[in-house]
């Protein structure tokens, strides 16, 4: 029928010229006038395309669905399924698409890999569009459905970012922890930096220490490795577990590139443990190493403990000289004040009551500042 063909070709030509509204109107007249035309499936498919380009997804789905129902084995049906898939994926409703494909008997075309890919694509589209809540829901569905999925790392990374955007710290930490456990990947450094920061701030020190330690292993810059190891030291110290502090100190000592701050703070912590365990000789050995630089609080404290050890061994002349030498090195104020208090005790031991009184008088003018906390969050190479 030439009239039939002409009517269809007119509508198709409009679509070819991207005159979609005119094309849709002509093709709708065509299928109404020629319901039994052999070109009906083609016209329905073209209508689905026209309305998709016009932004009317509901009408597009209607016509694509008509193609699949009336001519399921046709090439037009396969094209219609692609259009239907695109609409569902763009709306983040990939599971609805899978249900639809199963209902119309087209699920055989969906391999496990294509299902994986489509599910992630739908979630990613929502994430990139800034639809955080919808993206999080879709990403959670992907992670549950494809625990070994090809895009699992990407999904976990995007999901953790969604949680951070909405202030769900606990869920963010859980997701970041899962991603950190997937082995080294493109997100490892960023993930471990954020995970260590969040867990430290939340006083989850064991988790923070583990994250900092992993970060040291994966980061490639010198500064990054030093900061990571410093964080590892401080998180472990904040946790307060003596056995973990001992293991951490040994671990750091075995890594010369851990950085001066981490090496110093871990060595001092180990010396403190030894002193608490009455292993004074071993502690003093470490204190002597740290005492070489009194600009840091650890160095100032270590040098003072060396003075204290000399005093306790009974050599008052040596202790006196050492205290004056210590004062000339400009240690931190708290430990300098402690040293002058010790000097007064030296004079008492020596029977020099005049000097003892003079020292006591001078130290009343000294206000001893507090030492502060030994543990701080990671913040570069602080003294």
Q: What are the roles of these predicted feature ranges?
A:
Residues 1-383:
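Acidic, polar-rich low-complexity tracts and alpha-helical solenoid repeat scaffolds
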